Amino acid sequence: MIQDIAPHTYHNEYKPSAPDKNSFILAYEKGSILLPHQEREADIYFPRFQDLEEKVSDLYSKYIYLFSIDDQRFYLIPELDTTLLPDYEFQDIRNLRTARPQHLAFAGVTGHQLFQWYSKRRFCGCCGKPMLHSQKERMMECPSCSNQEYPVLCPAVIVGITNGDKIILSKYEGRRFKRYALIAGFAEIGETIEETVHREVMEEVGLKVKNLRYYKSQPWSFSGTLLFGFF
């Protein structure tokens, strides 16, 4: 699973310290992530501040601390002028699903979820004024009306429906993902995760399920969800 990065350890405590030269830079453009030009089969590599500091003059003035893996810190650069970086390009974030090393792939995907959240919280949804970053926690606050916004996490289920030695797979029409997959869907307001399973299965394949067993959970930052797995 994408979050299984042992022996590395993910630290999501919010510690808005300044980057050093060895800190990693994560930069995104819609559904793409900045990576060096390289073969698709090669291990991924994110630029460090020391790699770009001579090319981007204001690099150390517009960063956002994201998280750490082991003792390596990762920072978001929200608007990076890539015309100054001919050795880099934006690549589809979905490429990280199978990228190696896995701890960097996990970092890139998780950072993209935070990038999307920050991008959509630039202005207050209540009064329209620019939002400010809290220095105490991962939160955006409006200095005008005191509205506070925290990262959004959407609960969802993924279900392995079995009958003997068979399992149901489905394919969604009109989706970018063309392969067969397990039944999955988002929880709705006012229902439990277990009720979500029953509703989604009925909606998608018209079946009633029983003997529901919880398996495990998984962060899935591609869609901003926390997946709960069931059989």
Residue ranges and their predicted role:
Residues A18, D58-L59, P151-L153, F222-G224:
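A short catalytic or substrate-binding loop motif that flags glycine-/basic-rich loops and adjacent residues
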Residues T110-T162:
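Cys/His-rich short segments
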Residues L59-Q72, G164-K166, G206-F231:
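Active-site segment of metal-dependent pyrophosphate-handling enzymes
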Residues A181-K216, F230:
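The catalytic Nudix box helix
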Residues Q91, E137, C154, V209, ...:
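Short edge beta-strand segments in beta-sheet-rich domains
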Residues T83-C126, P130:
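A gly/proline- and charged-residue-enriched helix-loop-helix capping module
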Residues M1-P101:
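N-terminal alpha-helical interaction blocks
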Residues Y28-P36, M139-L182, F186-A187, K208, ...:
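N-terminal strand-loop-strand
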